[in-house]
C-alpha cells in the first residue's frame, strides 16, 4: 500500500475508476457497490473520490466503521463519521473470504458466523465460477471455486439461518444509499 500511496495520482485514479464503472454499466451489468480495491480507495488521496463516485453512480461505497487497518486512519474515520452524520448506510464490520481447503470451509464459516459482533457486517466474498480463472490466478482459483460451490449449495445461508443472522445483500444497501443521499440527476 505504501507504494500505491507514493505513486498515486488522484485525478488519474478517479478517471480510471470512472472508466471501470462506465464500462461495467455499458456491458449491461448492475453493480451495487464500490469496494475498496484492496484498501487503495481508503487512501486519503482517493477517499473523497470513492465517496463522490458512490454518489454520482448510486453505488454504495463499502467503508466499514470498525476497520483499524485503513491507510490514513484519521482521514478514513473522518470520512466514515461524515457518512454517519449524513445518515448514510455504513457497515459496522467486515469479514472476508476464507482462503482454505475444502474440509476447512464450513467449519471456518461456522466460526465466523458464531463470532459476528452486533451490527451490520459486510461479507467480502470472492466466489468464482469454476473455469478459466484457474489460468489467470492459479494460487487463488481453488479457494475461490470452493467458496462458489459452498455458497451455491446454501452453506452460508444455512449457517446464518441457524444462528438467527439476517442476510441483507448489497442490492438492499444500495437502495438505502440512494434514498438517504442527495438527489441524483
Model-derived features: where do they sit?
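Terminal accessory/targeting
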Residues: 3-29, 33, 45-185
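Active-site pocket-lining segments that scaffold enzyme catalytic pockets across diverse folds
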Residues: 38-43
Amino acid at each position: 500500500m505504501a507504494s500505491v500511496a507514493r505513486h498515486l495520482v488522484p485525478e488519474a485514479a478517479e478517471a480510471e475508476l470512472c472508466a471501470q464503472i462506465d464500462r461495467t454499466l455499458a456491458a449491461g451489468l448492475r453493480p451495487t457497490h464500490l469496494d475498496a480495491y484492496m484498501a487503495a480507495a481508503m487512501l486519503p488521496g482517493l477517499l473523497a473520490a470513492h465517496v463522490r463516485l458512490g454518489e454520482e453512480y448510486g453505488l454504495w461505497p463499502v467503508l466499514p466503521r470498525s476497520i483499524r487497518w485503513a491507510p490514513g486512519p484519521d482521514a478514513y474515520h473522518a470520512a466514515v463519521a461524515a457518512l454517519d452524520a449524513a445518515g448514510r448506510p455504513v457497515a459496522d464490520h467486515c469479514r472476508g473470504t476464507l482462503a482454505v481447503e475444502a474440509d476447512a470451509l464450513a467449519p471456518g464459516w461456522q466460526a465466523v458466523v458464531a463470532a459476528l459482533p452486533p451490527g451490520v457486517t459486510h461479507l467480502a466474498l470472492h466466489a468464482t465460477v469454476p473455469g478459466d480463472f484457474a489460468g489467470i490466478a492459479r494460487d487463488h482459483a481453488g479457494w475461490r471455486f470452493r467458496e462458489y460451490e459452498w455458497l451455491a449449495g446454501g452453506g452460508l445461508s444455512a449457517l446464518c439461518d441457524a444462528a438467527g443472522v439476517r442476510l441483507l445483500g448489497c442490492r438492499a444497501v444500495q437502495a438505502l444509499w440512494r434514498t438517504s443521499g442527495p438527489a441524483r440527476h
